[in-house]
């Protein structure tokens, strides 16, 4: 197989990871020598002059940041005005600030720092985020029912 540094196939999840073994550097390798890179994807809206939808792929040292971000999102609650009970807030109902930070160990690299900025306070931005969320949910449901090309 060619080693061009690009994905060979879109295999995902525990099925492909179950076929790997850790090499001396701790990387997940298949028997054929291909590396499987664990990647966490976050669909986001970049809140600039004109909001833009984007995909943030986090791998390697940023997987810990991704897990922390997921925990931060899961720790957000809203109070139901009728019952006064705390309910999980939709992930798209918050604005998060992402900063670039320098990390160091045996070498130096830059990564992300994620913090909660505020609740979404712009109705059109909230609606855009909600529609984006719903379209992704629908796409995921469709993708799981289709048969693979591989």
Specify the residue positions occupied by each region the protein language model found.
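Extended serine/threonine-enriched, polar tracts that run as long, contiguous segments within proteins
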Residues: 38-117
